[in-house]
Curated annotation (Swiss-Prot):
This is Ribonuclease HI. It comes from the Bacteria. It is an enzyme of class 3 (hydrolase). Monomer. GO terms for biological process: DNA replication, removal of RNA primer. Its EC number is 3.1.26.4. Residues 1-142 form the RNase H type-1 domain. Signal peptide: none annotated. Binds 1 Mg(2+) ion per subunit. May bind a second metal ion at a regulatory site, or after substrate binding. One of its GO terms (molecular function) is nucleic acid binding. Its cofactor is Mg(2+). Its main location: cytoplasm. Mg(2+) 2 binds at D10, D134.
Length: 152
């Protein structure tokens, strides 16, 4: 694991649920890659999670990764809460099922492939990486909204 990748992620949703987009900006050495996508009906949390998941999935080899997110839900979920969810068979302490368990499980499987540091950054502030990820997420959301408009 000799390569270090810095990733900025964000999600955007119009309504909750509603059309949403996700975006990620990856930096490796002197190279940057932008990725984004959308879902026609989703939530802001699912888009935040999908941005991180898709960014991790495109890494070709085991890496040291810093992921910057403005989602406390994502950061706390993957670093703190997930351990109890796994022990409780994907249920919370009140026995209610964990929301977005499908995505949490996919993210958890990525943890074994990389050394990941999850870092929170204030959203819509002066962090250029977060601003770029937000623009990508908004682009995804706008794509979803255009498709829905065409579908009538």
């Amino acid at each position: 694991m000799d390569s270090k990748v810095v990733i900025y992620t964000d999600g955007a949703c119009s309504g909750n649920p509603g059309p949403g987009g996700w975006g990620a900006l990856l930096h490796f050495n002197d190279t940057s890659k932008k990725i984004f996508g959308y879902e026609l009906v989703t939530t802001n949390n699912r888009m935040e999670m999908t941005a991180a998941l898709e960014a991790l999935r495109i890494l070709k080899k085991s890496s040291v990764v810093e992921i910057y997110t403005d989602s406390k839900y994502l950061q706390h979920g993957i670093t703190v809460w997930i351990h109890n969810w796994i022990k409780n068979n994907w249920c919370k302490s009140n026995n209610a099922p964990v929301k977005n368990a499908d995505l949490w499980q996919k993210l958890y499987s990525e943890l074994s492939k990389h050394t990941i540091m999850w870092k929170w950054v204030k959203g819509h502030a002066s962090n250029s990486g977060n601003i770029a990820a937000d623009k990508l997420a908004v682009q995804g959301r706008e794509t979803a909204m255009e498709i829905l408009k065409c579908l009538g």
